[in-house]
Amino acid sequence: MPKLKEECGVFGIYNNLEASNLTYLGLHALQHRGQESAGIVTSDGVNLHNHRDMGLVSDIFSEEVLSELPGKNAIGHVRYSTTGSSQLKNMQPIVINYFRGSLAIAHNGNLTNAKSLRDELEADGAIFQ
């Protein structure tokens, strides 16, 4: 029987003043799902605040770093690469700035039709950075 592998970990908090600290604890509990990188994005209702780095949750997020992630909403991610390499560009959550503001997203999985989706979006006028 083939060995099962974990695939990343995603955690979120909504409407809690301790969002960054609780997300840190959630990611720490999910650390077994990914040790390559970790990230947290918080929202204070106006701005997104982001910290991501390569390594373990406890090495990336000090009390000082967590204090710089204000807001009542947060998403966090720990990465285990099933595709793609272990590089900074593959860290999550992903933060996107666009004409309506900013958006943060974290996901666990692979888009098997990514090229056709991109082609379709570009045909409709989307611009990728």
Protein language model regions, located:
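N-terminal glutamine amidotransferase
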Residues: 1-115, 120
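Conserved glycine-bearing catalytic or ligand-binding loops at nucleotide- and phosphate-handling centers
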Residues: 121-129
